[in-house]
Amino acid sequence: MNMESIKNVIEIVKKPSNQFEYEEHYYFTGVNLGFNGTTIEMTGDVWEAAKFKDMTSNEAAAWCNFIKAILGKRYEINIKNISLTYNL
């Protein structure tokens, strides 16, 4: 999947603080994914976007792989308030 096919559900905002650091925010139906180059933090209504509470670990891992495919890089994903952490 490429960026063009998901641009209608994702908003990307880059806020350079200097030449080495940046932030990007991806919006999935009420869920905010923010990362700083090392960690992704998920906040918002996770149920609406990924239904993590009812997902099996395999399903949740598959969704995290979807996120990884979008980002095109390897990141640690910390799912806040759900107690799921996946190292991609």
Listing of model-derived features with the role each one plays in the protein:
Residues 1, 35-40, 64-69:
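Intrinsically disordered, low-complexity boundary segments flanking structured domains
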Residues 1-6, 86-88:
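Short, Lys/Arg-enriched, disordered terminal segments
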Residues 4-48:
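Short aromatic-glycine-(Arg/Gly/Cys) micro-motifs in beta-strand/loop hairpins
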Residues 48-88:
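Short, mixed-charge low-complexity intrinsically disordered segments
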